[in-house]
Amino acid sequence: MTQGKVDVLLGLQWGDEGKGKVVDVLTPLYDVVARFQGGPNAGHTLEFKGEKYVLRSIPSGIFQGRKVNIIGNGVVLAPDLFMAEAKDLEKSGHDLHANLHISRKAHLILPTHRLLDAAYEAAKGKGKVGTTGKGIGPTYTDKISRTGLRIGDIFDRFEEKYATCKARHEAILKSLNYTDYDITEVEKTWMEGIDYLKQFKIVDSEHEINNLLRAGNSVLCEGAQGTMLDIDFGSYPVVTSSNTVCAGACTGLGIAPNKIGDVFGIMKAYCTRVGAGPFPTELFDETGAKIRDLGHEYGAVTGRERRCGWVDLVALRYAIMINGVTQLILMKSDVLDAFDTIKACVAYKVNGKETREFPFNIEEGVEPVYQELPGWKTDMTGIISEDQLPKAFVDYIHFLEEQLDTPVRIVSVGPDREQTIIRK
């Protein structure tokens, strides 16, 4: 029997690279799409048949017919938000019940986790991380401290387990002087979400995914956020609470490392970041504002303005190394169509010394070293084949491939799945 293949798709920057669209483009090549980490703090935006969708917890393969979609054990799930997301998709004619499978080991985001999120941020004052307030961090905290609730718990003495967790959280909130809240209505909707979850296939996803592989099925593992937000390798402490890197696909789905084949790394032709945290190539001038406006750079979940800057090749080399990236996917190339000159950060100056390696701390004393390249000054949004690409843009791709020592396999020139060029 032929063993199926496992490929991984993940972001190489600070998230928002365009993973949702790429998964939707790649899913025809796979039998299974599996989400391996994160929660409803990250939104994957897709445009499908003229309609825009933002997926927060549900894998992006849900639009592709009878593909199996798996929410893995590494994901944290908010039942109320999941219910709202699923019902919106059902209204659009997408039936999730047959094709969506959820790991019983995935952890639940409780209403009090969101309160803890707000309380912890308030207590940090000026040092706050700038979370989305969805309760992600406190949920992963409970997971690591072995006090969390998992989806498998909803079938056995759940009310008792929930009451214990809630009481513990409320004691912490009291110690933080965070007592002005009423979660009655939120809790009611949350419990409705728990009942709604019971309608789906709750599975031991690690067994299911390995059985599917043994049967010869191909699997695409879908990450959320980006490498530079990884809890271990990102710009700590302003990071997320899970492993967004390739290794997270193994621990978040129960897949052995030797099963991993291709690792697709997604990058924008420039760089963005939402919220607080260091960002060496950030632009504070009209150029940054122009990139934001042309790229519609606003958070899919929060609506917050994204900070914009030139592409950072130091951070990208680091991300490619950590993930073992085999192929690059270049997104939002068309956003730079109007620029006379493009800049790329090829090195950092750290305390006066030039380096191509990503340092321990990029908060202070890091100065980007730029190389300028000519812009292509061509509207690429209507281009449908590689041979139509302007020479200056092809030169930009070759420059990236040389700097990053990794081939660019796919180029996106617009938000629709049709605006995608697969290079030979």
Language model regions located:
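Non-transmembrane, aqueous-exposed alpha-helical and coiled segments at domain scale
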Residues: 1-424
